[in-house]
Amino acid sequence: MTDPRFENSVIFICSHSAEGAMGLVINTPCENIAFPELLDQLNIDYGHNITPKAQLKNIQLHEGGPVETGRGFILHSADYAQETTLIISETIALTATLDILSAIACGKGPLYYLIALGFSGWGRGQLENEIVRNSWLTIEADAELVFKTDLELKLSRAHAKLGINFSMLSSQFGNA
């Protein structure tokens, strides 16, 4: 991958069709805003929440990708759903509404979640071509990796699921 924005990225593909694909980077922290600040910017009242403000500061935001970085996307456990929720698998769903952020702030949201600003997108056939060129390694969707693995361990855990020793990887690939 020659785009430095995706170097060492673990991306969860949320949707894929003949028209293209959409995914979220799940291992890059968003350092320029904290969750309480995001709530304030969006005018989401969390003053009467059951989650202490100090705990809200610990909710990590992620850089989901370079597209529409002003939009929020919440990848979450399937125990929570709204009318607009996209069910991805039996255990993982995606919601992009203010209501879910409010629910999370009030301690009434999904059991597990990952909040991302922006997303990664591919046009028709683009992702498939990048995979053929060995730009990406793929694994099955894994809720444990998405929600329960520490940020700095996600890449090595993804490699381990493939049986790959990261130190043995080369940036030069080819096909035989």
Residue ranges, per PLM feature:
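A short aromatic-anchored loop/beta-hairpin motif
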Residues: 1-115, 120-176
